Every structure is written in C-alpha cells, then in structure tokens.
C-alpha cells in the first residue's frame, strides 16, 4: 500500500472487518482504515482488493461456520437439473469452437476496453463505446476463442474461458450501470 494520505472517517471495523453489528462487514472504501472512506482513488481501490482477497474469505467463512445450521441442499430438483444442463452445454460449446484466439488475448482486449472507457474518467460517449465494443468482443469470443484440453480433465483454459464469458457480461453491465447513473456519489 502507499502511505497513509489522510482519512475522513468511515465505518468502524474490528481486526476481522466486522462492524459493531455482528455479521455485518465493511470493506474497502467504506471502512475506517488507512485507505478507507475514499482516499486517493487507487489507494481506496487497493484497500477493497486487499480486504476482499486476503481477509474476508477467512473472517466471513469463520463467522458463518458458527452461525449457519442449514440442511444439505437437495440436488434432485428441476432447477438444479436445468442449471447443470446449461453449464454442460456451455462447456461443450466452448470446447467445440476451435478458434484461433487464446482466452488470454480476448481477456486483454476486454481489459483494454474497460480501462479506456469505463474507468474513473468516463463520459457518456465512452460508456456507449464500451458497450458496443464489448458486445462485438462477446460475439468474437463465442466465434473465435481457442480452448485447449478436455472437459473432464483439470483444464485451466476452460476455467478461464468460463470466467471470461462471465466477465464479458459483467463488463457490459458495469458500463450500462454507469451510463444510467447520472448523479455523482463521490
């Protein structure tokens, strides 16, 4: 992390990022930490990344493991069968495309679109451009991605391709959400 710049408050949290309300956690810009309460843009972002990646998986999991006494989820339902069928079809489709572009190459293109058009300095025009470019990139992905390996092997490329398919949806949603938000919150 960069050095502390200054703080402007934020929600008080304990070492595990839990507020004074049991089970309610505050991370990133929201909490009262060195980089919380929306300090320098990159610093606040890094606080959220660090909290989400290093701290929360352990603290929330530990908290919930003592609180949740849920019965085992049934898998013999129509909804489960439908979800499983859709995932299997998606996997089969990805493995059958046989395109020329690697998952990483398409992922880099998405990152470039997001960086140039959906970052902190964005305009209506840049957001509209991002939406158009992401839609085109999604078509390109489903037409020309190359996913090597097999379905039932430990297949990192398949895992990355499945995530990238989700990232393409998420990127467009982020751009659309930003486009629809006309007021400033910070």
What are these regions (language model features)?
Residues 1-5:
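Short loop/turn motifs at secondary-structure junctions and domain boundaries
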């Amino acid at each position: 992390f960069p050095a502390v710049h200054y703080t402007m408050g934020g929600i008080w949290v304990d070492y595990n990022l839990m507020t004074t309300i049991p089970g309610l956690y505050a991370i990133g810009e929201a909490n009262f930490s060195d980089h919380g309460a929306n300090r320098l843009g990159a610093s606040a972002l890094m606080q959220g990344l660090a909290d989400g990646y290093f701290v929360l998986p352990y603290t929330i999991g530990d908290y919930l493991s003592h609180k949740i006494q849920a019965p085992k989820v049934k898998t013999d339902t129509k909804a489960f069968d439908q979800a499983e069928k859709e995932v299997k079809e998606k996997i089969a489709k990805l493995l059958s495309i046989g395109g020329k572009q690697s998952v990483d190459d398409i992922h880099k293109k998405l990152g470039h679109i997001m960086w140039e058009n959906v970052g902190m300095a964005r305009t209506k025009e840049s957001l509209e451009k991002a939406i158009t470019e992401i839609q085109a990139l999604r078509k390109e992905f489903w037409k020309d991605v190359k996913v090597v390996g097999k379905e039932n092997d430990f297949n990192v490329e398949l895992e990355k391709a499945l995530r990238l398919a989700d990232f393409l949806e998420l990127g467009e949603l982020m751009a659309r959400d930003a486009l629809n938000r006309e007021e400033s919150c910070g």
